[in-house]
């Protein structure tokens, strides 16, 4: 009699395990790699580390770093200081504008009312800062005092001097003054419109010479500044040559190698800009004491202005950019030499 064999428990077929469910992806991730936030965090962390490393290396050589910034600051402050002095000269009590006055000699039959009405009309014209009327009587009195011919002039039967309207223009360049003089000469009651261009031309020549001198000096000193920062960064590159070669050997990119040196150049520029701002503020304040004393002897209250905040910020931004550009040029020049041997 045959019997049916019952399988043992160990021989029973175990059920197939269920297929593992794929892990849920975090929001924002895809199959191609990390999300944008992760990449941004890594990028920012890399820049933070590069800046911290640059600060640490500059802090290890405080004296050398300070003198490098000081040399750059002197190069920055010289053209900026001359430019500020030119601006102060242009504002010297308005004397430049007074030197460019236009004198309108009226006809002899023009009375005081005609002259005052003409003065009021001219004040409302574009390009005119101010207008003053000098009557015939006032003109004769001033001429008597200045010429010393008072007794002789009193013997004249009639006053030979006309009334004058003295016009102060807003612009001091020659073409604008000529155009204004031509318009004023066409007004009624005006006999002659006289413009003394000698002082205007002298002013234009002085300011033009000063501007060109400042521009040329700025170009030369900026070139020297780029050489200074470039040579400084080159020395830092040479000191880290082995480290850089190892980084490139393990796959470090040129951007990764370049980054700390760019931050170092920008930090040099920032320090130089702050020092230059301080040098300018101290220098102008030091000169101002002598200028105030000199102007007081001439009955003027002229004083040198300080460094405007806008100019100071422009100086800082320009210094940082120059340091960055100088470092970029130095690294780009030596980057090909840093390939692993």
UniProtKB/Swiss-Prot annotation:
Any S-S bridges, and between which cysteines? Answer: none
Q: Which UniProt keywords apply?
A: Cell cycle, Cell division, Cell inner membrane, Cell membrane, Membrane, Transmembrane, Transmembrane helix
Residue intervals annotated with topology Cytoplasmic: 1-65, 234-263, 333-341
Q: Which residues lie on this side of the membrane: Periplasmic?
A: 87-212, 285-311
Which is a Gene Ontology cellular component entry for this protein? plasma membrane
**Where is this chain primarily localised?**
membrane
Residues spanning the membrane: 66-86, 213-233, 264-284, 312-332
- Which superkingdom heads the taxonomic lineage of this protein's source? Bacteria
Query: What sections of the sequence does the record tag as coiled-coil?
Result: none
Supply the Pfam families for this chain.
Answer: FtsX (PF02687), FtsX_ECD (PF18075)
| Region entry Disordered, spans | 1-34
Q: How does it sit in the membrane?
A: Multi-pass membrane protein
Annotated compartments: Cell inner membrane
Report any one BP term from Gene Ontology: cell division
Protein family per UniProt? Belongs to the ABC-4 integral membrane protein family. FtsX subfamily.
Subunit text:
Forms a membrane-associated complex with FtsE.
> What biological function has been recorded for the protein in this entry?
Part of the ABC transporter FtsEX involved in cellular division.
What's the protein here called? Cell division protein FtsX
Organism (species)? Pseudomonas putida
